[in-house]
């Protein structure tokens, strides 16, 4: 009888130890990936209409199966399966178009991003028919890990991270919470890579708030508004070799300490995007021809504004 009672706790302890070892082994595997935020690419040859998924990943809409409703975020989202068996998260509402364009613009510069497409009209069985739906891929071979933090990550102080921060002001992203960031485990050619992406870029192509007061800083914010983005302020001034931006509300502290040299690094990338590529990014997001023209012009003005702030344009071939 004594042995019987002794075996039970011993078995429980062994089970706990085995589970702990298994978890530790899994954790050690997860931290092994090479951290990647940005990579050198041939910017001028990137297809911003197809985007990071290209034509190969385009969703097959011949049939759609509803899986479940996603509870995160402010916009309504549904997890669905397309005719080819691929899984997607369908986002509805005002963030769908700007997010589709923003992903393509960042990817065009070499930043790692989610894979998404804008569908003009989509019927989800049991839920209804919706206009301008963003579909974000959930590939089976990509593992979604934890969020990453703006103030604590492997790229602090680098041109890549500082350039990404500038792009957040450039795109008027007023939702710079760490929970919008995600690490994606991808199998690269030379082993596993951890791609640091901004998973939610919906609060872009509009206007930032107009003050820093608690709660009230939300006043004036806009999303997916071409007219607002055209008139939105960007660079405020250069002071002591650092760029100061028009960025109000939460997260404004992360915009401090960005140098002129880091701004020039980003400008050299932006200058390699053609008008046609930029237009493709907005066309892929289903903006009208008139709005696309407006947005391309606004994009060019912002690039020139950055150029003036960081000094004369780079001569010769821009460095990647």
Where are these regions (language model features)?
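Boundary at the C-terminal end of the N-terminal hydrophobic targeting segment
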Residues: 22-24
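N-terminal, Lys/Arg-enriched amphipathic/low-complexity engagement segments
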Residues: 26-66
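Conserved ATP-binding subdomain of kinase catalytic cores across diverse folds
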Residues: 53-150
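Sec/Tat-exported extracytoplasmic proteins
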Residues: 82-84, 109-110, 168-174, 303-310, ...
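Conserved kinase catalytic-core segment
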Residues: 98-99, 104, 146-219
């Amino acid at each position: 009888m004594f042995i019987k009672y002794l075996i039970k706790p011993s078995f429980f302890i062994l089970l706990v130890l085995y589970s702990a070892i298994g978890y530790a082994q899994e954790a050690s595997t997860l931290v092994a990936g090479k951290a990647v935020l940005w990579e050198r690419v041939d910017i001028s040859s990137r297809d911003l209409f197809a985007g990071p998924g290209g034509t190969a990943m385009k969703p097959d809409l011949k049939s759609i199966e509803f899986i479940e409703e996603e509870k995160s975020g402010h916009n309504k989202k549904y997890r669905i399966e397309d005719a080819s068996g691929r899984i997607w998260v369908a986002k509805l509402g005002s963030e769908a178009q700007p997010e589709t364009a923003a992903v393509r613009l960042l990817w065009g510069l070499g930043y790692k991003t989610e894979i998404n497409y804008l569908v003009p009209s989509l019927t989800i069985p049991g839920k209804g028919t919706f206009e301008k739906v963003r579909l974000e891929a959930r590939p089976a071979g990509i593992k979604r890990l934890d969020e990453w933090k703006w103030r604590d990550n492997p790229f602090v102080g680098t041109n890549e991270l500082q350039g990404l921060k500038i792009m957040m002001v450039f795109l008027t992203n007023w939702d710079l919470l760490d929970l919008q960031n995600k690490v994606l485990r991808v199998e690269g050619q030379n082993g596993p890579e951890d791609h640091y992406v901004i998973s939610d870029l919906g609060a872009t192509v509009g206007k930032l708030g107009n003050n820093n007061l608690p709660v009230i800083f939300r006043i004036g914010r806009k999303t997916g508004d071409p007219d607002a983005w055209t008139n939105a302020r960007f660079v405020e001034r250069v002071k002591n070799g650092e760029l100061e931006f028009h960025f109000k509300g939460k997260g404004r502290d992360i915009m401090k300490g960005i140098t002129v040299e880091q701004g020039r690094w980003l400008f050299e990338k932006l200058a390699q995007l053609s008008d046609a590529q930029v237009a493709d990014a907005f066309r892929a997001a289903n903006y009208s021809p008139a709005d696309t023209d407006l947005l391309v012009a606004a994009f060019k003005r912002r690039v020139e504004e950055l150029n003036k702030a960081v000094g004369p344009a780079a001569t010769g071939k821009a460095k990647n």
